[in-house]
């Protein structure tokens, strides 16, 4: 059908007035063309309780994890289905203090989706994919992605084989990493997890950085984005759910973040995914599960927590051939410095390595307070050369000898010359410890082995023997 010439000329003259209407019509057409919105299944609110409400009439049409919506005078409000029974389903509202009443109409919305786009870099959004940085609306990408996607099939993934430098000497020497690896930073509160994460976020090996700040203090969010990330924010997307937000938003933030990271990975980018912290994600799941009536099974944690943790973390890693990688570095807050609490224990078994931060080292002023003996990278052999592996093994032996004889030396039981290995440990380990010190505002270490070699050679010139002259491998 051809537009009449008179109408065509009129549209050209007043295009500035017609274009917004056409854009609105196109948006509505795309919205209603989605089969999900062709038919709306609805129900009514039956009961309301703290943390959840129940809906009748939807049990046959919804699945666990799907979203529903209801309209109020203040807008449309979302909730997640967390339990389904024959007559009713339980819904946890996304927003705290959501206005809802008995007999309100609730509509099924299906899986929650986001539409990541390249233009999201440099932006800060909430768990729903909405901008919170005051820089205007977000552009929607072509592909709408469910935040509850499954991990890629294991046999379709590339192998993890390419090492990269983090710029943190203690990690690059003792626990080196590879692109596509999943690493956990384990520590108690106030030891320096977020500080170490900020140092790792500055690594040059990544095309994109996606950050999930879960349960963080509100005042720290802007400081982290503006001060810590700085210029690196231009290639980063921050997903934020602060501690005062609802457990549903704190649960959704890491899921939205990994979905955005998957988008960039599928575009061929090497992505760094930072989640701070996985423990608060687990706490949010626990709050939602307990509100739905799920019983706790391990120190107050319901079984669904241990189902959701691997589902989240397994989504990171390498993609299929021709795509990029997601390197996940996540923090785990250990309760009472107990590294065997259920979340820490479960997460340690899922990840490809763990960095342990020691409170006693932080109290001594050694930053980052990484315990090199307790920290492990399961892919270190792919990053070390044979000579580097021998060197690190020797360094760990010296550090272990130094630490296990600390009490003996304090009471005066050490006599130089009686144990050559202990003599070397006493002379060299303090130099090693001093070399590993690194403040967040210091430049990233370009060659950690060269820095260590220089320090040890300086010690040798002062009469101390070298550990190994072949430092670079």
Curated annotation (Swiss-Prot):
Coiled coil segments of this chain: none
GO BP: bacterial-type flagellum organization; protein secretion by the type III secretion system
Reactions that this protein is recorded to catalyse: ATP + H2O + 4 H(+)(in) = ADP + phosphate + 5 H(+)(out)
Entry's localization field: Cytoplasm
InterPro entries linked: AAA+_ATPase, ATPase_a/bsu_AS, ATPase_alpha/beta_chains, ATPase_F1/V1/A1_a/bsu_nucl-bd, ATPase_T3SS_FliI/YscN, FliI_clade3, P-loop_NTPase, T3SS_ATPase_C
Binding site for ATP: 187-194
Alphabetic keyword roster: ATP synthesis, ATP-binding, Bacterial flagellum biogenesis, Bacterial flagellum protein export, Cytoplasm, Hydrogen ion transport, Ion transport, Nucleotide-binding, Protein transport, Translocase, Transport
EC number: 7.1.2.2
GO molecular function: ATP binding; ATP hydrolysis activity; proton-transporting ATP synthase activity, rotational mechanism
Residue stretches spanning the membrane: none
Any Pfam family the entry gives: ATP-synt_ab
A cellular-component GO term for this protein: cytoplasm
Family: Belongs to the ATPase alpha/beta chains family.
Main localisation: cytoplasm
Protein name: Flagellum-specific ATP synthase
């Amino acid at each position: 059908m051809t537009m009449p010439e008179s109408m065509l000329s009129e549209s050209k003259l007043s295009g500035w007035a017609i274009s917004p209407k056409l854009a609105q019509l196109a948006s509505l057409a795309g919205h209603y063309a989605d089969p999900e919105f062709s038919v709306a299944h609805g129900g009514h609110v039956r009961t309301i309780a703290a943390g959840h409400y129940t809906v009748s009439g939807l049990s046959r049409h919804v699945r666990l994890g799907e979203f529903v919506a209801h309209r109020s005078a203040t807008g449309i409000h979302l909730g997640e289905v967390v339990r389904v029974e024959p007559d009713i389903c339980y819904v946890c509202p996304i927003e705290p203090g959501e206005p809802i009443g008995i007999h309100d109409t609730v509509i099924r919305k299906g899986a929650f989706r986001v539409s990541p786009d390249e233009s999201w870099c440099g932006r800060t959004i909430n768990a729903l994919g909405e901008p919170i940085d005051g820089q205007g609306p977000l552009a929607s990408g072509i592909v709408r992605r469910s935040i509850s996607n499954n991990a890629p099939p294991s046999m379709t993934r590339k192998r993890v084989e390419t090492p990269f430098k983090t710029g943190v000497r203690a990690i690059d020497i003792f626990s080196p990493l590879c692109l596509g690896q999943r690493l956990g930073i384990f520590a108690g509160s106030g030891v320096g997890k977020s500080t170490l994460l900020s140092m790792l976020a500055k690594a040059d090996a990544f095309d994109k950085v996606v950050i999930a700040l879960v349960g963080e203090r509100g005042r720290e969010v802007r400081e982290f984005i503006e001060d810590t990330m700085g210029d690196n924010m231009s290639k980063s997307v921050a997903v934020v759910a602060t501690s005062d937000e609802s457990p549903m938003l704190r649960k959704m933030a890491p899921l939205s973040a990994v979905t955005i990271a998957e988008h960039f990975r599928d575009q061929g980018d090497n992505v760094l995914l930072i989640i701070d912290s996985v423990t608060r994600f687990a706490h949010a799941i626990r709050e939602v599960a307990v509100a739905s009536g799920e019983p706790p099974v391990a120190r107050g944690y319901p079984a669904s927590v241990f189902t959701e943790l691997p589902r989240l973390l397994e989504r990171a890693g390498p993609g299929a051939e021709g795509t990029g990688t997601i390197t996940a570095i996540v923090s785990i807050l250990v309760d009472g410095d107990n590294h065997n609490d259920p979340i820490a224990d479960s997460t340690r078994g899922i990840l490809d390595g763990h960095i342990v931060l020691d409170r006693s080292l932080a109290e001594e002023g050694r930053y980052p307070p990484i315990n090199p003996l307790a920290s492990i990278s399961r892919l270190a052999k792919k990053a070390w050369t044979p000579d580097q592996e021998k060197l690190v093994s020797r360094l760990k032996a010296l550090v272990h000898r130094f630490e296990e004889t600390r009490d003996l030396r304090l009471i005066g039981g050490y006599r130089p010359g009686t144990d050559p290995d202990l003599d070397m440990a006493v002379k060299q380990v303090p130099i090693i410890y001093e070399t590993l010190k690194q403040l967040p505002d210091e430049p990233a270490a370009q060659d950690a082995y060269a820095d260590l070699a220089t320090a040890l050679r300086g010690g040798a010139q002062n009469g101390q023997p070298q550990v190994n002259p072949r430092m670079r491998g």
